[in-house]
């Protein structure tokens, strides 16, 4: 039912994998350029159309989708429940990067700025969906980290089977990062 409303934007810009802090900055720039390429798929968007800016592992609930379909008048921040490794492992703080915005406001800026640098949240939808972080087996996690913008996480001290398995057992982040609201 949605096939005619989904657009695939080919992003061919290439950037080498970072090997240094300067490289990480360049890699973050690639991630930014990739997200901003969303605009290429919106060439015929109408001012009142709602644009949702989510990563592939950020899944809105059916209720949130229905709310967004009714339209928005302002930038809306979506608080997703954070899950690590499996759906049963809940991290006790909201994931707050997903946003939805009317196209008329988006075209004044960029998708990446809206996602990361928007001034205080204008409107918030709580319990809007799920962020499924680092799902999959250890090899899948390592593949993700190999192309991750935070390339410092792709370090053997974090990516060994022993560390990844222990992190699952202990219910902690594999890099022992502390989370909070």
PLM feature segments, named:
Residues 51:
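Short aromatic/hydrophobic "clamp" motif used to bind/position activated sugar donors
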Residues 54-55:
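Active-site acidic Asp-centered loop
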Residues 1:
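SAM cofactor-binding core of SAM-dependent methyltransferases
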Residues 4-11, 18-44, 59-181:
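Catalytic-site signature of metal-activated, phosphate-bearing donor transferases
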């Amino acid at each position: 039912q949605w096939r005619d409303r989904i657009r695939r934007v080919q992003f061919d810009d290439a950037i080498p994998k970072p090997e240094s802090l300067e490289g990480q900055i360049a890699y973050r720039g690639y991630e930014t350029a990739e997200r901003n390429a969303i605009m290429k798929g919106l060439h015929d968007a109408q001012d009142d159309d709602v644009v949702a800016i989510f990563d592939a592992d950020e899944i809105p609930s059916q209720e949130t989708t229905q709310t967004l379909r009714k339209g928005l008048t302002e930038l809306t921040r979506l608080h997703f429940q954070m899950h690590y490794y499996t759906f049963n492992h809940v991290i006790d703080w909201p994931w707050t990067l997903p946003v939805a915005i009317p196209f008329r406001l988006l075209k004044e800026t960029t998708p990446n700025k809206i996602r990361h640098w928007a001034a205080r949240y204008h409107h918030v939808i709580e319990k809007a969906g799920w962020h499924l972080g680092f799902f999959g087996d250890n090899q899948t996690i390592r593949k993700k980290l190999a192309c991750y913008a935070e390339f410092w996480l792709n370090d053997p001290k974090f990516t060994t089977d022993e560390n990844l398995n222990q992190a699952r057992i202990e219910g902690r982040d594999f890099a022992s990062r502390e989370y909070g609201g």
